[in-house]
From Swiss-Prot:
Protein name as it appears in the record: Ervatamin-C
GO molecular function terms attached to this record: cysteine-type endopeptidase activity
Residues forming the catalytic site: 25, 157, 173
Subunit structure: Monomer.
Family from the record: Belongs to the peptidase C1 family.
Subcellular compartments: Secreted
S-S bonds: 22-63, 56-96, 114-193, 151-196
Regulation: Activated by thio-specific activators such as cysteine, beta-mercaptoethanol, DTT and glutathione. Inhibited by the thiol-specific inhibitors leupeptin, iodoacetamide, PCMB, NEM, mercuric chloride and sodium tetrathionate. Repressed by the active-site-directed cysteine protease inhibitor E64 (L-trans-epoxysuccinyl-leucylamide-(4-guanido)-butane) produced by Aspergillus japonicus.
Annotated E64 binding sites: 25
Gene3D superfamilies: Cysteine proteinases
Length: 208
């Protein structure tokens, strides 16, 4: 495995987005991984529509939260997802619009529970969605450096791991580019279930 990887430097990650006051982190983290695997497979980096998931993925709950697996399943069952340009983000749930199927995926896989080595293996291949406990003031007010807590393991926020170094994960948040390190946070790698539960619920999409 590479000692370090940063998918941003490989051109596989879109600019940081902002979910606003809508609890749609699940859509942002899912879409982020789909954008990345599509770029890795096709060479085209296309910003995709979180709003389509918020409006149309009825197994999830729009601005009231959702699960990665249902979001991936929606994209698979729907035959693809539209672009951000065609179906822009509104930060409120609305009626499902007719949408183009611009980027598709074949499936999704989970990473073994609380296995940081397996998570590193996954991220070496592509960015992965993870759920974390983002409820601490220290997390919310993070501005720079390697974050080491405090935080619990009550999973309440979906984010994307886009790379790693020997001692930290490079994590893409959806709170805009003025949060953290231009929208990112470096989270200490601690083994096991990970800091803030980061290794408890990782998934990634598959695309041939």
């Amino acid at each position: 495995l590479p000692e370090q990887i940063d998918w941003r430097k490989k051109g596989a990650v879109t600019p940081v987005k902002n979910q606003g006051s809508c609890g749609s982190c699940w859509a942002f983290s899912t879409v982020s991984t789909v954008e990345s695997i599509n770029q890795i497979r096709t060479g085209n980096l296309i910003s995709l529509s979180e709003q389509e998931l918020v409006d149309c993925d009825k197994k999830n709950h729009g601005c009231l939260g959702g699960a990665f697996v249902f979001a991936y399943q929606y994209i698979i069952n729907n035959g693809g997802i539209d672009t951000q340009a065609n179906y822009p983000y509104k930060a409120v749930q609305g009626p499902c619009q007719a949408a183009s199927k611009v980027v598709s995926i074949d499936g999704y896989n989970g990473v073994p529970f609380c296995n940081e080595x397996a998570l590193k293996q996954a991220v070496a291949v592509q960015p992965s969605t993870v759920a974390i406990d983002a409820s601490s003031a220290q997390f919310q007010q993070y501005s720079s450096g390697i974050f080491s807590g405090p935080c619990g393991t009550k999973l309440n926020h979906g984010v994307t791991i886009v790379g790693y170094q020997a001692n930290y994960w490079i994590v893409r948040n959806s709170w805009g580019r003025y949060w953290g390190e231009k929208g990112y946070i470096r989270m200490l790698r601690v083994g096991g279930c990970g800091l803030c539960g980061i290794a408890r619920l990782p998934y990634y999409p598959t695309k041939a």
